[in-house]
């Protein structure tokens, strides 16, 4: 009798594990979530190197924040901060914690993340932005003013 209860418990546990794995697998297959991850960024117009983590927000949009900067301090040891931010309350944000991307939604028809913004911490400016993949690991980021024709595109590499 005890052996039968033990066997039923093991079967129930196995079924529970299989169902959890199945649900996790289905979530991972959502094409909109492909953008989630860490990206290496080397801008051709700046000597800085950084890593940005793109994540899904609680409201279902996508955003990104710096998580690493190759040189987080100036030569004198002073930490680099978001001193150009137009919001005075954000000017003390460490360089490796700056919010770079916000408000992206996935457009399945275009296979792009659209209607977002990108922040340029060097100039303290925010631009409209869209993103798409060029291959499996290269994320194209197009920041622009007004329409995408008036902007520039960067390539970020997914780790």
Residue ranges and their predicted role:
Residues 136-138, 144-159:
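Edge beta-strand at a domain terminus
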Residues 13-22:
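Bacterial N-terminal signal peptides
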Residues 36, 41-128:
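Central antiparallel beta-sheet cores of small beta-barrel/beta-sandwich binding domains
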Residues 86, 92, 140-146:
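Short aromatic-glycine motifs in intrinsically disordered, low-complexity regions
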């Amino acid at each position: 009798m005890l052996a039968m209860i033990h066997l039923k418990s093991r079967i129930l546990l196995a079924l529970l594990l299989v169902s959890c794995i199945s649900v996790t697998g289905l979530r991972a297959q959502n094409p909109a979530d492909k953008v989630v991850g860490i990206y290496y960024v080397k801008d051709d117009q700046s000597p800085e190197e950084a890593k940005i983590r793109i994540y899904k927000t609680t409201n279902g949009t996508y955003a990104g924040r710096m998580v690493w900067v190759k040189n987080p301090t100036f030569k004198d040891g002073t930490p680099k901060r978001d001193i150009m931010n137009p919001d005075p309350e954000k000017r003390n944000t460490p360089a490796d914690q700056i919010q770079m991307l916000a408000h992206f939604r996935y457009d399945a028809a275009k296979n792009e993340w659209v209607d977002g913004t990108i922040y340029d911490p060097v100039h303290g400016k925010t631009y409209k932005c869209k993103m798409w993949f060029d291959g499996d690991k290269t994320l194209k980021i197009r920041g622009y003013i007004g329409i995408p024709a008036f902007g520039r595109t960067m390539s970020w590499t997914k780790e």
